[in-house]
A protein has these predicted regions:
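Accessory nucleic acid-recognition modules appended to NTPase machines
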Residues: 1-94
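Active-site-adjacent loop/helix micro-motif of nuclease/hydrolase catalytic cores
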Residues: 71, 111-120, 135-136
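Generic beta-sheet signal
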Residues: 59, 108, 127-129
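Conserved catalytic cores of phosphodiester-cleaving nucleases, focusing on short active-site segments
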Residues: 84, 96-117
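Nucleic-acid nuclease catalytic cores
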Residues: 101, 123-134
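Short, solvent-exposed amphipathic alpha-helical segments in soluble enzyme
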Residues: 121-123, 141-142
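Short, solvent-exposed loop/turn segments at secondary-structure junctions
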Residues: 63-64, 111-112, 131-132
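Domain-level recognition of nuclease-like catalytic cores that cleave nucleotide substrates
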Residues: 132-148
Length: 148
């Protein structure tokens, strides 16, 4: 996958040799240390789904480069989440890449990214890399850097 995938807590905890609860605590501590960003579903009514993060990304895209892993999809999504989270609440949506303030839905991609995944969803936008100017609901990804 080109972008971060949903967290499989059971598989990850088994790989690390810890329980799921211990994994959640470790992830929470890494988030508090600002190394990771945990994204949760915000529309779920099931309290268990709120207990574990649905997606785990690095807090800052620079960490990806420092580790020598610079998948452009992950960098784009990490950048948007990092910039948006400065003053807004970011969550993991059922559709799209990022739900902001439980209202605005974003799909992240390159200049050719289409609205196919989020069409017919109100308040949805494409945050596109490699474009200088926005049009309609397509916003240049670099503009989100001004939110920081």
């Amino acid at each position: 996958s080109q972008t971060p995938s949903p967290l499989n807590a059971k598989m990850t905890s088994d790989m690390l040799g810890v329980t799921v609860n211990q994994l959640i605590k470790i992830l929470s501590l890494l988030e508090r240390s600002q190394l990771l960003r945990l994204l949760y579903y915000k529309t779920e009514r099931n309290p268990k789904s709120m207990a574990k993060p649905q997606k785990v990304i690095f807090d800052n895209p620079s960490i990806l480069y420092a580790l020598g892993y610079a998948n452009i999809g992950k960098v784009r999504e990490t950048f948007l989440a990092s910039m948006i989270s400065n003053g807004h609440e970011a969550a993991y949506p059922k559709d799209g890449d990022l739900l902001v303030d439980n209202r605005y839905l974003f799909e992240v991609g390159g200049a050719r990214k289409s609205f196919d995944q989020i069409k017919d969803i109100p308040d949805s936008f494409v945050a596109a890399d490699d474009i200088e100017f926005g049009f309609g609901n397509k916003i240049p990804l670099w503009l989100f850097g001004f939110l920081y």
